[in-house]
Amino acid sequence: MEKQTLLVTGGAGYIGSHTVVELLAAGHDVVILDDFSNSSPQVVDRIAEIAGRRPALVEGDSGNRDTLRRLLAQYPVDATIHFAGFKAVGESVAKPLAYYGNNVSGTVVLLECLEEAGARRLVFSSSATVYGDPASVPIREDFPTGPTNPYGRTKWHIEHMLNDLAVASPQWSIGILRYFNPVGAHASGRIGENPRGIPNNLMPFVTQVAVGKRPKLSVFGGDYPTHDGTGVRDYIHVVDLALGHLAALEKVVAGKGAWTVNLGTGKGYSVLDFVKAFEKASGKPIPYQIVDRRPGDVAQCYADPSLAAEMLGWRAQRDLQQMCADSWNWQQKNPDGY
């Protein structure tokens, strides 16, 4: 693939920052658009430090028409990777309008501006939450969708919108990536997951328990129909996920139309499997307590990743032990985040 100028919305976020590092390493020019509502400006310095060159940065909201028009007039964007969005399941249940407004309405504005600028190549961050509670696992892309919470429904609406757009306007080329559960951190320990306040995701919560920031891990639900009663998920290393975006970008640049693939490892681990792996990686005990299930959570969710291998030539390489080791390295080097 020739060198591209890439707009990365939410490029200072957890998955976005790791992807920007890989895009820069592959020789592309990157423009990050981020309002830092859930990330830190320091991330951009860390990205530059790892990659040896700096992405351009526009501070602003990816759903703001004026910001987007200015950016697209200034930079010759070849393709866009759209990460920006609110992403906490529990918060989406409490604040559905904020989620529909930011995620769905914001994406409509982004697409209108890209259409206007003739920048009709897009890779979209979707989520395995669109599958809801699957009838069986592993989950294939042709399984029925039925998200069980507003966050998942925002992703589901955007997927439909992108498919409708590709039908109406055949010059669009769109890759939809359904992520499973990203964990881990860059091997340098310079960028990683840095949640504000109480973490919603398992890994940062576990790392905070390991360093004594939190007394114990709350495990939501011990009565699921799984091998140990705790929820089973497909954890994928964030660097593998970032490389999946590079593979998706190649396909988007080369083709037309819309397509959807899962990005997961194909292996399901329970919360307690995860805790054991982290204890091994860190040498620290992780005290935990089983509490009530969380609304909107499903029993088990892991990918059939074969379509991504076939279509994109991409496979996850890093195992759970590596994910835990890299997260522990990040936590030790950055006890207070950025």
Model-predicted regions and their roles:
Residues M1, A94, N102, S169-Q171, ...:
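A generic fold-level signal
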Residues M1-A185:
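N-terminal Rossmann-like NAD(P)+-binding domain of SDR-like oxidoreductases, especially those catalyzing
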Residues T5-L7, L97-A98, P134, N149, ...:
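Short, contiguous strand/loop micro-motifs
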Residues G60, L72, Y99, N194-I198, ...:
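Pocket-edge positions in alpha/beta enzyme catalytic cores
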Residues Y100, T148-W156, G192-N200, P204, ...:
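Short-chain dehydrogenase/reductase
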Residues G184-H186, D223-Y224:
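Short, basic/glycine-rich phosphate-binding loops at helix/coil junctions
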Residues S188-R190:
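Catalytic core of nucleotidyl cyclases, primarily class III adenylyl/guanylyl cyclases
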Residues M203-Y338:
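C-terminal substrate-binding subdomain of Rossmann-fold SDR/epimerase-dehydratase oxidoreductases
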